[in-house]
Amino acid sequence: MITSIVDSIHQIPVAEWERLARPAGLYLSHRWLAGEEQDPTATSAYCLVRDLDGTLLAAAPLYLVRDEPNDSYQPETVLPPRLRPRVIAGARRGYHNTPLVGPGQDACLTRLRDAARRFADRHGTTHWWPYLTTRAATALAPLYPDPPLHLGDDAFIPLPGTGIDDYIASLPARRRAGIRRERADFAAAGVRVRHQPLADCFEEAGALLAGHQRDHGHDRDGVDAMTALLERQAAAMGDEARVVAAHDAGRMIAFCLYYHYGATTWIRAVALDRGHPAPHLYFNLMYYLPVEDAYAHGTTALHAGMTTVEAKRRRGADVSALYALADRHPGAQVTGGVLDTPPPADRQSPA
């Protein structure tokens, strides 16, 4: 096998990358990663493992982070004090991460780890994998010095059958009645629902998203920052960046940004005017309207992400844990919670 690192996703053919990425999810797709390269807060690279014939067997993005604006991706926020890696391995956004490994190629995981170590070491730091799926964390854990750290939970809502009525019918009777009431009350409120590309509405959506972030204590995420983020995402993702929005009196009062990718519809962002009286605005924009479009597009699950997990369970979500795995500087080990040296033999820097 041959391991290499390239500087841009554009150096890797789309079809070759997508063969590994499509089962893994949106936030490791070729197009998404191309957009992430425009983010000025980090420098990207890509570790590739090929066989001697040149077939891509495994891969992982690597990010040398200079300024992390998202608290949930800051090591000082989510990792123990002794761990301060500045290189992210895998997806940097989306709270859903896994190494890209072809079927039967788990032996390549060691090569991905070794390449990430060398890349980080060149920059005087270490690497970590944030928000790994349970399956990915289980596969990678034997290669790292510390056990996986639980960061949160991930929610996928299965979409059985061929339409939203089939989804509702799959839920317990009490929940079926509640969802039908929430949809009916929202429809009776008379707000206008529009489906459109993000490129057509990123300014309105950016203003709503900034307000949502401010309500959740993220003061640095102002209107200019959120509008620029959505504009960059619209430019990178094109018509794949879909918005369903509620309007009243000519004004956007709520929106949901989502993507259909693989067999899943991925919710990326939801924001609303909390002062608007339309009933069940959040539930309709977060769940029911995207579910309708998911069925129209033929996907079979809705990725609802982290937070408010119990509300997602009540709407049929399957919930699984998300983990972090972090490397240590060569020569370090933990004794009684303190970094010491020398390392055991199997923790030496890889050849």
What role is predicted for each listed range?
Residues A59-Y63, R93-L109, A173-R192, V244-H247, ...:
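A broadly tuned preference for mixed-charge, low-complexity surface segments
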Residues I2-T77, T126-A278:
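A conserved beta-strand-loop-helix scaffold within acyl/acetyltransferase catalytic domains
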Residues S44, P85-R92, D166-R176, H195-A199, ...:
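Noncatalytic linker/hinge segments flanking ATPase motor cores
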Residues T43-A45, V65-P147, T264-V319, A324:
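Acyl-donor binding region in acyl/amide transferases
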Residues L64, A141-L171, D248, H297-A351:
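Active-site/acyl-donor-binding loops of N-acyltransferases
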Residues Q11, V101-G102, A169, D327:
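Generic structural "secondary-structure junction" signal
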